[in-house]
């Protein structure tokens, strides 16, 4: 790795999107003009028109962010979650620019690139920590897999024609059992992702909690559950039914052994997000989902 400048920003982009390529070019030019160094993965640099001053790294490891003060991610939700993997492993804050649809993890839109560069150069941003979950898979008392998630860990059925038979547990006590398509164990950040699509509540990110949301459960009591952030959630797949599959943030998957037990608890390592705006989460929610608020009068003054 070549010698870095005093201030360096790592850039991660979805180079399969033409909009991302153009956006990356604009961000790189703006940062270099302002005297900041830019670092990019060599595999992505092949698809980007980058000047020679850009530092290239070969391997996508947490160490490739050593010395970087910020990780800028250009893309949709999938790219932002990929960036979150780098951010968590390195401790470097992530600043997302949404080039997709909803982009709840993003702090800016494509039209905000000039402002993004200006805020980064002047360090006019704040950093907040987002809760994660750690996931442990047990089989006959042995740990067979571990993972983590920023949004959610989902236990889902594999066979389309048969339900996944599960028993839910919270803090060492059984809650209920039923057949379903799956169970989503989510963070407040993930409450607007898969858990939201499954009928779960929207939880403000300032709230510390864990969510357990059934997917298409065949039961009268199959409501979303909101627990303490210190609770331990467990999904036990019944041994006499087809096995399931574990998805973490929709990116990493592993087939579960028959009769597996999946435990989800508050993660030991958060993801740090860079924030440019002081807008409330309520305003972000309204904007992202284009919610109808016509007729709102507000509290009398």
UniProtKB/Swiss-Prot annotation:
Known catalytic reactions: NAD(+) + ATP = ADP + NADP(+) + H(+)
Matching InterPro entries: ATP-NAD_kinase_N, ATP-NAD_kinase_PpnK-typ_C, NAD/diacylglycerol_kinase_sf, NADK
Main enzyme class: transferase
GO CC annotations on file: cytoplasm
Cofactor(s) needed: a divalent metal cation
Location, primary (coarse class): cytoplasm
Family annotation (Pfam families): NAD_kinase, NAD_kinase_C
Binding site for NAD(+): 77-78, 82, 151-152, 162, 181, 192-197
Subcellular location: Cytoplasm
Active site: 77 (proton acceptor)
Keywords: ATP-binding, Cytoplasm, Kinase, NAD, NADP, Nucleotide-binding, Transferase
Documented EC number(s): 2.7.1.23
Stated role: Involved in the regulation of the intracellular balance of NAD and NADP, and is a key enzyme in the biosynthesis of NADP. Catalyzes specifically the phosphorylation on 2'-hydroxyl of the adenosine moiety of NAD to yield NADP.
Family, per entry: Belongs to the NAD kinase family.
Name the UniProt record assigns to this protein: NAD kinase 2
Organism: Streptomyces avermitilis (strain ATCC 31267 / DSM 46492 / JCM 5070 / NBRC 14893 / NCIMB 12804 / NRRL 8165 / MA-4680)
